[in-house]
Amino acid sequence: MSQKLILVLNCGSSSLKGAVLDNGSGEVLLSCLAEKLNLPDAYITFKVNGEKHKVDLSAHPDHTGAVEALMEELKAHGLDSRIGAIGHRVVSGGELYSESILVDDEVIAGIEKCIPLAPLHNPAHLLGLRAAQSIFKDLPNVVVFDTSFHQTMPEVAYKYAVPQELYEKYGLRRYGAHGTSYRFVADETARFLGKDKKDLRMVIAHLGNGASITAVANGESRDTSMGLTPLEGLVMGTRSGDIDPSVFGFLAENANMTIAQITEMLNKKSGLLGISGLSNDCRTIEEEAAKGHKGAKLALDMFIYRLAKYIGSMAVAAGGLDALVFTGGIGENSDIIRERVIGYLGFLGLNIDQEANLKARFGNAGVITTADSKAVAVVIPTNEELMIAHDTARLSGL
């Protein structure tokens, strides 16, 4: 094991997820999840050596309290002195950051400037960052942005067809998300296939409760489905994905809904949950669809159809298709969705290998198309925490 470990933090508005990683081996020595932050019943759960235990945070139920509890846990296991640097996931770096960066006052001001682009996430990231700076004194902090990988998109891909002063004044454009995952998976795909990533035209689908898809050529993002916010694009667990923007005026007029209510509905009550009326969990949707539930069947059909349509358009953005890559919780585990999506893609020369598709689950990478396919479809597990740890170690000089 390398001497210095990396602490990776991912702060949400009411949660904090943390992991201590050995950057060399990728081994996770300790992980934690703080929930219900800023509520009286806040708590943090630690997992070490497969054992879990819960710590009450009611005396100090905020992000600082969670980081303090994490420090105590690290001390209890003799890990505190081995932490060399802290890496933070940050949702939006806007157009300011095209790569990960070592934190200073200027970077904190930059993250603050991007708050309008991620009003729920960036303030929470800043709380976690400040807590880490005050509790882990003298340790370098690095921020890794979800948006930075997509800063290579050409103007035709990131601009919206609206008056350009809206872009100039307010930064209204496509930013995308899941960039850290795409960067990791693009590297891993090239390694797995024994190719240089610059020679591969990839379409990568990151499918989880939040889902997006990206065209990668020459190792760079060329286009992506998420937009100004993560609401655009694919059908997701609770998000609608693409929808006619006139829905705001229509529902305001006919359903007497406010902008806030419509935004909440499109983000939290739509997608698989809204269509099925059952659940946002893809596993539940698959099970119920198999039993004949009409709503679940329609939700699954729409998810698969939208994804297949987007794969076609992203192949255009990539300039062709050498590798279709599935990642994320659904992408890595749902052989049903992968098989049905590839069923739409015969015109791209892709044919499913059913046995290989069944094997490529539960953390197993694998090619899932037949040898005579014109391109490969491959399953590659993502590891955003490890990517953040790599960046943090590199920028901290560890």
UniProtKB/Swiss-Prot annotation:
<comment type="pathway">
    <text>Metabolic intermediate biosynthesis; acetyl-CoA biosynthesis; acetyl-CoA from acetate: step 1/2.</text>
</comment>
<dbReference type="GO" id="GO:0008776">
    <property type="term" value="F:acetate kinase activity"/>
</dbReference>
<feature type="active site" description="Proton donor/acceptor">
    <location>
        <position position="146"/>
    </location>
</feature>
<dbReference type="Pfam" id="PF00871">
    <property type="entry name" value="Acetate_kinase"/>
</dbReference>
<keyword id="KW-0963">Cytoplasm</keyword>
<feature type="site" description="Transition state stabilizer">
    <location>
        <position position="178"/>
    </location>
</feature>
<keyword id="KW-0479">Metal-binding</keyword>
<feature type="binding site">
    <location>
        <position position="384"/>
    </location>
    <ligand>
        <name>Mg(2+)</name>
    </ligand>
</feature>
<comment type="subunit">
    <text>Homodimer.</text>
</comment>
<feature type="site" description="Transition state stabilizer">
    <location>
        <position position="239"/>
    </location>
</feature>
<feature type="binding site">
    <location>
        <position position="89"/>
    </location>
    <ligand>
        <name>substrate</name>
    </ligand>
</feature>
<protein>
    <recommendedName>
        <fullName>Acetate kinase 1</fullName>
        <ecNumber>2.7.2.1</ecNumber>
    </recommendedName>
</protein>
<dbReference type="InterPro" id="IPR000890">
    <property type="entry name" value="Aliphatic_acid_kin_short-chain"/>
</dbReference>
<dbReference type="GO" id="GO:0006083">
    <property type="term" value="P:acetate metabolic process"/>
</dbReference>
<feature type="binding site">
    <location>
        <position position="10"/>
    </location>
    <ligand>
        <name>Mg(2+)</name>
    </ligand>
</feature>
<keyword id="KW-0808">Transferase</keyword>
<comment type="function">
    <text>Catalyzes the formation of acetyl phosphate from acetate and ATP. Can also catalyze the reverse reaction.</text>
</comment>
<feature type="binding site">
    <location>
        <position position="17"/>
    </location>
    <ligand>
        <name>ATP</name>
    </ligand>
</feature>
<dbReference type="GO" id="GO:0006085">
    <property type="term" value="P:acetyl-CoA biosynthetic process"/>
</dbReference>
<dbReference type="GO" id="GO:0005829">
    <property type="term" value="C:cytosol"/>
</dbReference>
<dbReference type="InterPro" id="IPR004372">
    <property type="entry name" value="Ac/propionate_kinase"/>
</dbReference>
<feature type="binding site">
    <location>
        <begin position="329"/>
        <end position="333"/>
    </location>
    <ligand>
        <name>ATP</name>
    </ligand>
</feature>
<dbReference type="GO" id="GO:0005524">
    <property type="term" value="F:ATP binding"/>
</dbReference>
<keyword id="KW-0547">Nucleotide-binding</keyword>
<dbReference type="InterPro" id="IPR023865">
    <property type="entry name" value="Aliphatic_acid_kinase_CS"/>
</dbReference>
<dbReference type="InterPro" id="IPR043129">
    <property type="entry name" value="ATPase_NBD"/>
</dbReference>
<feature type="binding site">
    <location>
        <begin position="281"/>
        <end position="283"/>
    </location>
    <ligand>
        <name>ATP</name>
    </ligand>
</feature>
<keyword id="KW-0418">Kinase</keyword>
<comment type="similarity">
    <text>Belongs to the acetokinase family.</text>
</comment>
<keyword id="KW-0067">ATP-binding</keyword>
<dbReference type="GO" id="GO:0000287">
    <property type="term" value="F:magnesium ion binding"/>
</dbReference>
<feature type="binding site">
    <location>
        <begin position="206"/>
        <end position="210"/>
    </location>
    <ligand>
        <name>ATP</name>
    </ligand>
</feature>
<keyword id="KW-0460">Magnesium</keyword>
